[in-house]
Regions:
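Acidic/histidine-rich helix-loop elements
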Residues: 1-3
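Active-site catalytic loop in hydrolytic enzyme cores
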Residues: 71-142, 150-163, 167, 172
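Active-site flanking residues adjacent to catalytic metal/cofactor-binding acidic residues
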Residues: 28, 128, 179
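Active-site/binding-pocket entry motifs
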Residues: 31-32, 99, 183
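Detector for methionine-enriched segments
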Residues: 5, 11-13, 114, 125, ...
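CN hydrolase (nitrilase-like) catalytic-core segments centered on the catalytic cysteine
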Residues: 48-65, 131-199
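Cys-nucleophile CN-hydrolase/nitrilase-fold catalytic domain and related Cys-dependent amidase chemistry
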Residues: 5-86, 92, 154-174
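Structural motif
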Residues: 23-24, 122, 146
Length: 199
């Protein structure tokens, strides 16, 4: 996790130093926790990760959408949390559609979560949520202008990743901004990458 934290901080600072007028930086699903065994993911580590993301938003002076895990009393949630530069949490979404073995170890979320930046209403989705058109439709019906998607999508479903990005955007008339993990993830699993913006 420490190495992941160093990489995240370096990337966030690079964006902050080289890009002007950035309103939101997105990081992929469970960005810091790759390689963590879930039974070992305790409240102390969960809180440490939460505090880290808060500090990153403050350091870069912009909003950060962080894919993270959170340990609560009833179990572990797969979250996408938006941290403001002043330390506030603007949005906190728990993944609704858990994928395969996630169902054995994680608790599903139950609610749509939207937040607003500069008059733009943004809905949050995580990875497998993207495969369900009803969820993005519900966001659109509730006035969402943009979907922010944090993911850890893997091969061989790379074509499906592209299709979901294009479909969710065009079928709802919304922008879709998605970020995906890239490269080998262990046990022969390779993540697609291919982060994109569709309109």
């Amino acid at each position: 996790i420490k190495k992941n934290m160093e990489n995240v901080e370096k990337m966030a600072m690079t964006v902050a130093e080289n890009e002007k007028n950035v309103d939101l930086i997105l990081f992929h699903e469970a960005c810091l926790e790759s390689g963590v065994q879930l039974p070992e993911f305790d409240k102390k580590l969960s809180d440490e990760i939460h505090d880290f993301w808060k500090s990153i938003a403050k350091k870069v002076g912009t909003n950060v959408l962080a894919g993270r895990l959170e340990r609560k009393e009833d179990g572990i949630y797969n979250k996408a949390t938006v941290y403001a530069p002043d330390g506030r949490i603007l949005a906190d979404y728990a993944k609704i559609h858990l994928f395969n073995s996630e169902r054995e170890t994680l608790i599903p979320g139950k609610e749509l979560v939207m937040f607003e930046l500069n008059g733009i209403k943004i809905g949050i989705m995580i990875c497998a949520d993207f495969g369900f058109p009803e969820l993005s439709r519900a966001y659109a019906v509730n006035g969402c202008h943009m979907l922010a998607v944090t993911s850890s999508w893997a091969y061989p479903d790379d074509d499906l990743w592209t299709i979901c990005n294009q479909a969710r955007s065009s079928e709802n008339g919304v922008y879709c901004v998605s970020v995906d993990r890239i490269g080998p993830a262990g046990n022969g699993c390779v993540k697609v990458g291919r982060s994109m913006v569709c309109n």
